[in-house]
């Protein structure tokens, strides 16, 4: 694919092109490969020396000469050349590609942030409550709660038929990717975004996941450990990479814009929204999908149980337990700038008007992290939104029943809100779905601001000394805060505003 692309682009414009592959020397280092390639590119540029592509036999060189045309593929020999611009390329399964151009001279690329508002215009939900936004609204309004300590979302033929997935496509995907594809397609449909040849490169996505396709990775590794490396399945191997889900969704929809997978623990779903918002504000896309997806399986149950984080019985937020209800699911959120949203009369669930992501390093194994890290995220998000903390009408938090997580949240909320602001917890309904839950907190907040959820909802008032649960009226909410936390001390906060 790279060979053909180079000829297509450069045959007429740059016939003296030199091409080198560092993988011939260092092997394929998977996720590190792109970074290693970039280091080689920079060294080549600064020293005017192009490293060789090693490993060619005489027969290889003869065959290459017949196809290379005027390009120099650097077979086995380093060459000196006066270099001004060097391109580093990288690709991954599912059609994800990246290119960086390095130059000795200062470039003319300027980052300019636009002043357009960014709206949430579509949602997609796959959860243990069932699939679809309408189903989620019904179940939450009916106060349906988990009845087991490990709960699961499911996708099946009804979902595939609804979104036109053919067997030849969906049989290739593992559960992680299937959940992501279904929620992503619903969000696009809800937003009324139609992918065309004209707009495909202006529509992108950021997939957030804490654990990714870990079940598939485990099963693949277990199989080759027991049966030898030759027993590895070429059919299943593409699903072992974290960005496979985003690649499959891109293939299905035809979206060819920015496509990145964010892996930053349980708050990755909210991080994806922060990054997607920034891409739109920096004029790198008119619309983006921000998603959070994580899987529950027998493998995940064993791993989280080994950490001592699966509850012994069903726990709600602030219950003082030692673990949480383990869950899975996928939440996708469509974001659009105001011009693009207006061009197709999109529904506006809420405006995204501020965010922050922080990290406060903690000791290995520390689940909750530090109060300072969460505090900084909340303060910075409010500052970006241009509001004061006392303008926040409600919080959509991350308490999950595990005492060390819930206590951190209680301390910070008391410090900022003094127990006067209602706190909503989506994990009470769906369990701890990690990245899916952090994105769902934002989706739930948006559904509240838009009036799609019932205006009378359960919420907590929390201090370090006391927690009370009350039914609150959400109809007057104007600004709301959503927060998330991940093992290791990573935090995210997002401010949403009701659309007038």
Language model feature labels by segment:
Residues 29-50, 67-75, 100-102, 181-193, ...:
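Active-site-proximal alpha-helical scaffold in enzymes
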């Amino acid at each position: 694919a790279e060979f053909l692309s180079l000829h297509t682009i450069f045959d007429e414009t740059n016939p003296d092109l030199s091409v080198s592959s560092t993988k011939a020397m260092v092997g394929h280092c998977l996720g590190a490969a792109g970074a290693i390639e970039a280091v080689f590119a920079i060294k080549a540029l600064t020293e005017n020396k192009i490293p060789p592509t090693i490993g060619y036999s005489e027969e290889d060189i003869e065959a290459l000469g017949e196809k290379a045309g005027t390009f120099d593929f650097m077979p086995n020999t380093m060459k000196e050349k006066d270099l001004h611009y060097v391109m580093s390329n990288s690709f991954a399964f599912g059609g994800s590609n990246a290119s960086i151009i390095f130059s000795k001279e200062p470039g003319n690329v300027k980052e300019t942030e636009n002043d357009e508002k960014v709206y949430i215009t579509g949602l997609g939900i796959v959860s243990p409550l069932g699939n679809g936004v309408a189903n989620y609204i019904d179940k939450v309004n009916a106060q349906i709660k988990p009845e087991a300590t490990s709960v699961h979302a499911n996708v099946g033929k009804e979902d595939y038929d609804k979104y036109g997935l053919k067997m030849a496509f969906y049989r290739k995907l593992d559960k992680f990717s299937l959940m992501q594809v279904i929620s992503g397609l619903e969000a696009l449909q809800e937003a009324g975004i139609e992918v065309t040849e004209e707009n495909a490169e202006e529509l992108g996505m950021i997939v957030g996941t804490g654990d990714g396709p870990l079940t598939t990775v485990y099963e693949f590794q277990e199989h080759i450990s027991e049966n030898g490396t030759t027993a590895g399945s070429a059919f299943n191997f593409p699903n072992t990479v974290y960005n496979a889900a985003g690649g499959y969704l891109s293939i299905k929809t035809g979206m060819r814009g920015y496509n990145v997978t964010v892996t930053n623990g349980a708050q990755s779903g909210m991080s994806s929204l922060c990054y997607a918002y920034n891409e739109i504000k920096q004029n790198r896309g008119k619309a983006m999908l921000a998603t959070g997806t994580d899987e529950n399986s027998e493998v995940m149950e064993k791993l989280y149980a080994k950490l001592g984080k699966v509850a012994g019985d069903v726990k709600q937020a602030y219950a003082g337990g030692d673990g949480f209800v383990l869950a899975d699911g996928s939440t996708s959120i469509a974001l659009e700038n105001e011009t693009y949203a207006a061009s197709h009369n999109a529904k506006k669930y809420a405006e995204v008007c501020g965010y922050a992501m922080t990290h406060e390093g903690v000791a290995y194994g520390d689940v909750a992290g530090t109060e300072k890290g969460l505090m900084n995220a909340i303060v910075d998000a409010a500052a970006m939104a241009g509001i004061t903390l006392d303008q926040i009408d409600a919080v959509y938090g991350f308490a999950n029943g595990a005492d060390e997580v819930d206590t951190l949240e209680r301390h910070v909320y008391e410090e900022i809100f003094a127990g006067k602001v209602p706190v909503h917890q989506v994990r009470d309904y769906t369990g701890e779905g990690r990245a899916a839950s952090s994105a769902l907190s934002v989706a739930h907040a948006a559904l509240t601001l838009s009036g799609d959820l019932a205006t009378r909802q359960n919420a907590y008032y929390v201090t370090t000394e006391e927690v009370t649960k009350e039914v609150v009226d959400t109809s007057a909410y104007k600004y709301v805060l959503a927060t998330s936390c991940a093992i290791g001390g990573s935090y995210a906060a997002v401010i949403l505003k009701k659309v007038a």
